[in-house]
Amino acid sequence: MSSILTPGTRYNVGMDGSEQAPSEQAHSEQAHYEHPYPSPELAAAHPFVEYAVERLPESEMLERARAFRVEAERRRSVRLFSPDPVPRELLEEAVLAASSAPSGAHKQPWTFVATRDPGVKAAIRAAAEEEERVNYLENRMNAEWQEALAPLGTDHHKEFLEVAPWIVVLFEQRYEMRPDGTTRKNYYVKESTGIAAGLFITALHRMGLATLTHTPSPMAFLRTLLGRPDNERPFVMFPVGYPLDGVRVPDLVRKSLDQVFVEVDRPS
């Protein structure tokens, strides 16, 4: 059960996340907070529940972390998919996992729109290839960008959009449309949707499926093709399926830890 804190009492947070009065804190590590959360007023106005997480031995934490890191490092973007069908239930589980992502003001400003219809996939491919043809062949994509993509061997041909059993388009909701026709502002929309996209990719990888983050530019045609409302804008497109047997991917090297992680131990 969530606790209601007594005004004027200085509370600490125990190892299990529970708020404790001073007399209860002798045998736990303590963090001292001048302003407990939730405040008594907030807890009285809105529901709160206890967040209980088992604290594992550090050796087990490290073992889990390394196992997850090894599995995550095996993930690769795939451009050749098997046409074998993928049950809708697997996509639903991935979307539910993605929707556990933190979001600005808990607005969850995203919609995952999926299709396995051959006609819809063909229309998406045709429109995407037209945009990419302009990008690659008419130099809407500048030389520096094309040079960066050269090791990946990408071009305007997007056959995977028809071969993959599913196409999932993630839309960001720029604002909320309420049932009465009024609108409400959403916050940190791109940041929130990006986090959800990462969890979606990770969930697919965890269950043995492959995907590719595909962003034909511009992507406005997707809102029209998929019949989405004005408040939604396409964020990224995912072909989803099993990787084709024998598929090859670029032999790339990811950045080392010291290239992506910095610890700061004093003010600058």
Predicted features, each with a name:
Residues 97, 151-156, 222-224, 247:
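Glycine-rich, charged/polar anion/phosphate-binding loops
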Residues 12-16, 41, 113-193:
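Glycine/small-residue-rich phosphate/adenosyl-binding loop
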Residues 133-141, 227-250:
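A glycine-rich helix N-cap at a beta->alpha junction
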Residues 46-54, 69-83:
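Generic N-terminal amphipathic, Lys/Arg-enriched alpha-helix
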Residues 5-19, 31-60, 236-268:
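C-terminal helix-cap and adjacent tail motif
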Residues 99-106:
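Glycine-rich phosphate/pyrophosphate-binding beta-alpha loops
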Residues 93-98, 174-225:
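Small-aliphatic-rich amphipathic alpha-helix that forms the alpha element of a beta-alpha
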